[in-house]
Structures are given as structure tokens and as C-alpha cells.
Amino acid sequence: MKVERSIEIAAPPDAVYDVVMDPERLGEWVTVHDSLVHAPDGVLEQGDELAQRLKIAHKCFNVTWQVAVAHRPRDVEWEGRCPMGTKARVSYDLEPRGDGTCFNYVNEYELPGGPLGKIGGKAFQRTAAKEADRTLVKLKGLFER
């Protein structure tokens, strides 16, 4: 399953990159973020790993993320391991637009459970899409107050 979203942010890609790659700032913009379990200090680099507690639809669970790609200030890819064998891949493309950034977000994930997982997956996808929209609006708000 896949969720894709984009938003224009009135800040240069370097500034946006610094925020989205700082684990201590996740709570400021990621709506499903509950807490950090562990993470390195400062701006993350390729190969770094963090564990995050997420809360989606009143359910909490931990996800371990590895930064698979980090090409400052343009491209980021995360690989996530979730409970019950669920895998996720999230990418950010920070496209320069004049003095600002077009932040392109893609979240691809595989839910366990075969056909039953796919049925429940449709509801999960709707929730994930709604939260992606809310998250990107919060990120934009950090720069456009």
C-alpha cells in the first residue's frame, strides 16, 4: 500500500532537511509520533537507526527505522520494521521551488495477514493518508508562522 503527498513550504530545502532529520523534533510535526525509544543526537545521517513509538487509531507500537539514504538537502529514505512483520519504506524528496521547498512524501508499507490484512489495510490506508496530510500541514506551520 502507498500514500503519496506533497506540500509547498516557504523555507529552503536545507532548513526543512534540518528539521525532518532531527529526531528530537519529530513531536513538533509528526502527528502519529508518541515518543522516541532511542535515537542518535543531532541530524541523522545515512546508516543511522532510531526507534520510535507511534500512535495510530488509539493503538501504540514501536517502529525501528534505518536511514537508508540521506543526500542532504534533497533525498531521504527510511526503512522501517514494525510489529508482526510489517515493513515500511518512507521517502522525502525536498525539491527546491524558488525560495522554498516542495516537500514530496511517500509511505509504502506491507501489512501482514494475507487477504485479511488487505481488507483491514484499506481502513489503515485511509487513516495513514489523513495523518500524512495533517503531518505535512504541521511541518509547513513550523516555517510559516
Named regions from a protein language model:
Residues E79-R134:
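Beta-strand/loop substructures that line and gate deep hydrophobic ligand-binding cavities in soluble
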Residues K2, E8, Q66, E77, ...:
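Conserved beta-strand segments that form the floor/walls of ligand-binding pockets within enzyme
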Residues M1-E45:
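Hydrophobic ligand-binding cavity/cleft-lining segments
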Residues T31, P73, G85-K87:
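A generic structural motif
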Residues K2-E4, C60-T64, T86-S91:
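Short, surface-exposed coil-to-beta transition loops
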Residues V37-P83, R97, C102, R134-R145:
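Glycine-rich portal/gate segments that line the openings of hydrophobic small-molecule binding cavities
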